[in-house]
Amino acid sequence: MSKIAIFLANGFEEIEGLTVVDICRRCGLTIDMVSITEEKQVMGSHKIPVTADMTLSQVNFEEYDCLVLPGGGQGTKNLEACEPLMQQIDAFYAVSYTH
């Protein structure tokens, strides 16, 4: 069974983030919501607070088959500015691409 991580940054587009989570869970897929900060609570672009399942520092990237980065003006900028996440995505892609 596939395991998915969706990374949430303050300012993420709620529709793009939560719809993915909803559909995956309805299909029986495992998807973890991950805050890119040390706080589990993330604020969406329309000021809707969302509580993630874990924080970035708690993620073992080797457990995941798919990484999701939802859009949203400020959320996208915050994802891109998160250097630890960008490094992990590069490493994840390098390993995935070779298999």
Model segments located where?
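Extended, subdomain-level signal for the structured scaffold at the beginning of enzyme domains
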Residues: M1-Y93
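Conserved small/polar residues in nucleotide/adenosyl-binding loops
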Residues: T98-H99
